[in-house]
Design a protein with these regions (language model features):
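Active-site cores that bind ATP or allylic diphosphates and position pyrophosphate for catalysis
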Residues: 132, 136-179
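The substrate-binding groove and active-site-proximal loops of carbohydrate-active enzymes
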Residues: 5-7, 43-52, 106-118, 144-146
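Charged, often glycine-rich, active-site loop that binds/positions anionic groups
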Residues: 82-99, 155-157
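Active/ligand-binding-proximal structured segments within catalytic/core domains
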Residues: 50-61
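Non-catalytic terminal extensions that flank enzyme cores
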Residues: 1-49, 63-77, 93-103, 129
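Short catalytic/ligand-binding loop motif for oxyanion handling, primarily in non-cytosolic enzymes
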Residues: 45-47, 82-86, 148-151
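Short, solvent-exposed turn/loop segments enriched in Gly/Ser/Thr/Pro and often Arg
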Residues: 76-83, 143
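A glycine-rich helix N-cap at a beta->alpha junction
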Residues: 94-134
Length: 179
C-alpha cells in the first residue's frame, strides 16, 4: 500500500497504467460505475507460470486502481474453452484419446484424467484451484457457458449487421496470406 501523499509521485508501472486508464476511459468508467479487467486462459493445457503472471499483473493493476479511486473493481478470468484442441499435450494420460479428438472444442474433448465431463472442464478446474491457491480474487467465465446461454447474441447480431463495414476496416490491416 502506497501512502496517499505519494500516489502522484510513484512511477511503479501498475500505477502509471492505472492512472492512464482512468484518464483515457473516464467517461466510460463513470457511466458503468465500476472497473472490470479481464485475463484470458486457453485451457488446452495445464495452468503454468505464464497463466500466473497474467493474473498477477492484472491483480497489481486492480490494487493500484483501488488505491487511486473508490470505484468497485472486478477481475474476470475468461476461459476460451470453445477453442479447438490443436495438439496433444505431452503431460497428460490417454494421449490416444486426445489424438482422436483433435480440433474439437475443448469442452467436447473427453477428459483423459476421467474426473470431469471434458478436457476443457478439467483444465478450467485446475486453473481455478491454481488461482485460489494464491488467493487471487476473480470471477470465472467460460466461453462455452456464455455462448450457450445467449450472452453474446446481441453482440453477434450487431457484428452480422455491420459485417461489410467491419471487414473494410479489418482486411487492410491483414497481410495478403490472411485476407
Amino acid at each position: 500500500m502506497i501512502k496517499k501523499e505519494n500516489l502522484d509521485k510513484t512511477s511503479a508501472w501498475p500505477f502509471v497504467e492505472a492512472k492512464k486508464m482512468l484518464r483515457e476511459r473516464k467517461s466510460f468508467i463513470e457511466k458503468k460505475g465500476k472497473i472490470t479487467l479481464q485475463t484470458g486462459y486457453g485451457p488446452s493445457g495445464l495452468p503454468h507460470i505464464g497463466t500466473f503472471g497474467e493474473v498477477a499483473r492484472t491483480s497489481m493493476m486492480v490494487n493500484a486502481i483501488n488505491q487511486l479511486t473508490d470505484l468497485p473493481t472486478e477481475i474476470i478470468t475468461f476461459s476460451d474453452d470453445m477453442d479447438g484442441l490443436r495438439k496433444v499435450p505431452d503431460n497428460v494420460p490417454q494421449r490416444d484419446l486426445l489424438e482422436k479428438n483433435l480440433h474439437k472444442p475443448l469442452t467436447q474433448v473427453p477428459d483423459p484424467f476421467n474426473k470431469f465431463d471434458s478436457f476443457g472442464e478439467h483444465n478450467n478446474e485446475m486453473l481455478k484451484n491454481f488461482l485460489n491457491s494464491f488467493n487471487f480474487k476473480y470471477s470465472f467465465k467460460s466461453s462455452t457457458f456464455l455462448y450457450k446461454s445467449g450472452f453474446f447474441n446481441s453482440s453477434l447480431q450487431t457484428i452480422l449487421k455491420n459485417y461489410d463495414g467491419i471487414m473494410n476496416i479489418i482486411l487492410p490491416t491483414l497481410g495478403k496470406e490472411r485476407q
